[in-house]
């Protein structure tokens, strides 16, 4: 059994990329409610992430904000340098930042879109994971990495964003391989694959009405709320999930 002390907050902070809105913001708030300090990464919307930070601080937890585009290697390095200098130890990384590009058939998808999606969703997550592992090593932390995938990795999303689905499938393969590589160090690497969730990602992809269109195809008959996904992510970082690694958990309403 897991005792109450192990269920509590752990030393070090949780870094969430793309923490200003949607699943990232909901995860930050859920983690704060569980007693954790946060490092909140954002790329563009500083006002949104400052609002999340204010809510976290109102709960009595720390929130450190860092602007960085995880699709740029230099930004990732700068972010982790700042974490080392200003925050110190991490105990968890949530690789949440991700983009889809416009919705449409693969043949209509520009090369630049495909490259940018892979740069953020795959290379950015890999670089953040590598820097987080270095932080764990410096501080002697048996940390946790949670990579946010998508149910699209398993459905393929034909006619919508095959390139995005492929990027998330790559992320799931990375999750499995890295988990096996670092398991002997007591470090866990997990994934979570949300289904369609009520966030701004649909409008950003050019189809704000997509939630209403796809809800009937989901066995539970509705899209997820960001808070539902967030609770699963925070659970994966907790001692309650201490024997789970290398697995990507589907949280997709039955898809």
Model-derived regions: residue spans:
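Alpha-helical segment proximal to the catalytic Tyr-Lys
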Residues: 134, 176, 180-181, 242
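Catalytic Tyr-X3-Lys loop
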Residues: 91, 107-126, 146, 171, ...
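Active-site helix of classical SDR
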Residues: 129, 167
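Short, small/polar-rich loop/turn modules that mediate ligand/substrate recognition or access, typified
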Residues: 183, 188, 244-246
